Each structure stands twice: as structure tokens, then as C-alpha cells.
């Protein structure tokens, strides 16, 4: 229920560029920052794991795709972002990079470049009637606004999840002791670093 309400209310519309969708005579879509949209799946990612987070991300993507982006890739995009976020905050590797990714704020902000890449990919394949250069121009012209909107959502969700993870640290991220990261277990990496 929270995912439905969060995905549909409290949004800010950013107008992107004057470029419409290639081949369609319509107003440029822009990007919408739905402030609470990522909050349900980030909290589910920390408390319940990747499958629950992906389910809520897919539900959020379905609602956003229908009401906002009008793009099927939104469903897959947000489901994948939710699953990756859950994997980041629930992994138990001990190196500094993985310790940073265990923090919800860092994990959520690290998803922004990946989301932009997925947007460029989906915008490129969303309209097949236009030429390759028109589709690439449209995708790259709107990537900045997409990054701004998704970055705002992830900043808010990451801050809330950071507070929740500090307040309920026993329930957040699963149980288990820290283990060596893949780089620490690699004989090649250990040989090169001299340990």
C-alpha cells in the first residue's frame, strides 16, 4: 500500500529539453521526481532482502510507467535498482569499498549512474522508427534531468534508510559475520599486492 501511495503522490516535474520523443509529435516528457517513490523498496531492501525489494520496485515501476514515463522499461529499471540496492546493503564483505556500500545513503547514490545508463539504453530502444542519431540525441539530451530526478529520489530515500538502519541496526541488513571480499580471496590479487 505504501508503494502505491509513494509512487503516485508528492512529485516535482522537471522539464528536460525541447527535444520530443523521436518520431512522435508530442510534448517532451521531462522527468518527475517522486519524493517518496524509492522509500518502500529501499526499506524493504534493508529489512527483507532483494526479492521483496525487487517486487516493490517492480510495482513502483509499473505505476510510474503507467502514470509518468509511459515506458515498459521503467518496470524493469526500478525492479533492478531495488534488487541491487538490497544486495549492496546486505552484503557482508569487509573491505572499505564494501563497508561503504553497506551504508544505505552510499548504496542509494551509487545507483544514480546505473539508472542513467539504463535510461539511455531504454530511450534508445523505446522508439524504433527514428534514426539512430535522433534516438541517441534524445537519450543523451534527457540524461541530465533523469539523473537529477532519480538522484533526488535516491538522496531522500537513502537519508531515511540511513536513519532507519542506525535506529534498527539489529534488523537491518541481515545477520552474519564479515567475510573476505572476492578481491581478498583471489590468489592473483594477493600475489600482485604482495600479501
For each feature predicted by the language model, list its residue ranges.
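Membrane-embedded alpha-helical hairpins and interfacial helices in multi-pass inner-membrane proteins
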Residues: 8-36, 64-195
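Alpha-helical transmembrane segments
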Residues: 1-10, 50-58, 107-111
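Short, solvent-exposed segments of well-ordered alpha helices
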Residues: 27-30, 42, 46
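Alpha-helical transmembrane segments and their helix-entry boundary regions
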Residues: 41-45, 53-57, 75, 103
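Interfacial segments of multi-pass membrane proteins
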Residues: 48-49, 60-67
Amino acid at each position: 500500500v505504501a508503494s502505491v501511495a509513494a509512487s503516485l503522490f508528492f512529485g516535482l516535474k522537471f522539464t528536460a529539453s525541447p527535444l520530443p520523443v523521436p518520431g512522435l509529435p508530442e510534448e517532451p516528457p521531462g522527468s518527475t521526481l517522486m519524493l517518496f517513490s524509492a522509500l518502500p523498496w529501499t526499506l524493504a531492501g534493508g529489512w527483507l532482502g532483494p526479492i521483496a525489494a525487487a517486487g516493490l520496485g517492480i510495482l513502483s515501476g509499473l505505476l510510474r510507467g503507467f502514470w509518468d514515463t509511459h515506458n515498459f522499461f521503467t518496470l524493469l529499471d526500478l525492479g533492478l535498482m531495488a534488487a541491487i540496492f538490497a544486495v549492496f546493503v546486505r552484503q557482508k564483505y569487509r573491505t572499505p569499498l564494501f563497508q561503504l556500500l553497506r551504508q544505505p545513503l552510499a548504496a542509494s547514490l551509487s545507483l544514480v549512474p546505473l539508472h542513467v545508463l539504463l535510461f539511455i539504453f531504454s530511450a534508445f530502444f523505446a522508439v524504433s522508427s527514428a534514426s539512430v542519431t535522433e534516438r541517441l540525441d534524445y537519450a543523451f539530451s534527457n540524461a541530465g534531468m533523469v539523473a537529477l530526478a532519480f538522484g533526488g529520489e535516491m538522496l531522500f530515500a537513502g537519508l531515511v534508510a540511513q536513519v532507519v538502519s542506525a535506529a534498527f541496526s539489529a534488523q537491518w541488513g541481515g545477520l552474519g559475520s564479515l567475510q573476505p571480499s572476492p578481491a581478498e580471496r583471489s590468489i592473483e590479487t594477493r600475489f600482485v599486492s604482495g600479501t
